[in-house]
Design a protein with these regions (language model features):
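Domain-terminus/edge residues, biased toward the C-terminal soluble/receptor-binding domains
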Residues: 73-77, 85-187
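Active-site-adjacent loops and short helices of periplasmic peptidoglycan-processing enzymes
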Residues: 1-94, 104
Length: 187
């Protein structure tokens, strides 16, 4: 279990950041934090993971940038753990596809989580009944017009400065297809 220290929330107040309603002081399992990060884009989950893996968010983003360099991501720089807009936080479709391909091929837990249309986080001292979280990738939700039965997930992202972004993959007749789009109109 990881502790949700108050530092994980400091930069997020009044930003409109996506959340999984994790509270300062709450103890949350690593799996639930990964689900909160990957399903509803929980910014506090990203920071909690960062602060429990490294001594600081800056230290964690240094690790992110080292991994990006090792993967050959030449047009990427991370300056925060959650992906909200920052001057020195950027990437390209090609680089995000590289990262997604790496995660899909290497981590079963990643594949298991990104395909979920929803997830029930375990109960905690702050949420005695647990917390239900819902995926922002509507291709995974059979109740929407966007549903695509071959879709296996990955991640949506939406910022005024970046537009609508989507990293997605599908499996069809033994072949995996991966696509990353960025900058789609907001309307």
């Amino acid at each position: 279990y990881y502790s949700a220290g108050s530092e994980a929330f400091d930069e997020l107040y009044d930003t409109g950041a996506s959340t999984a309603d994790i509270q300062p002081g709450e103890e949350v399992s690593c799996y639930d934090l990964l689900a909160a990060l990957l399903i509803p884009s929980s910014c506090e989950a990203a920071n909690i993971i960062a602060l429990n893996v490294s001594d600081s968010i800056t230290g964690f983003t240094d690790l992110m940038n080292e991994k990006a360099e090792k993967l050959g991501m030449e047009n990427t720089h991370f300056s925060n753990a959650h992906g909200l807009w920052a001057q020195q936080n950027y990437s390209s479709c090609k680089d995000m596809a590289t990262l997604c391909e790496y995660a899909i091929s290497k981590y079963q837990v990643f594949r298991d989580i990104v395909c979920l249309p929803s997830y029930h986080m375990a109960s905690t001292s702050y949420h005695s009944d647990g917390t239900d979280i819902y995926n922002t990738n509507l291709m995974l939700d059979s109740m929407t017009d966007y549903y695509y039965s071959y879709a296996k997930g990955i991640k949506t992202g939406t910022l005024d400065s970046a537009g609508r972004c989507l990293a997605s993959y599908a499996e069809y007749e033994g072949t995996t297809y991966l696509i990353v789009t960025m900058g789609a109109p907001m309307d």
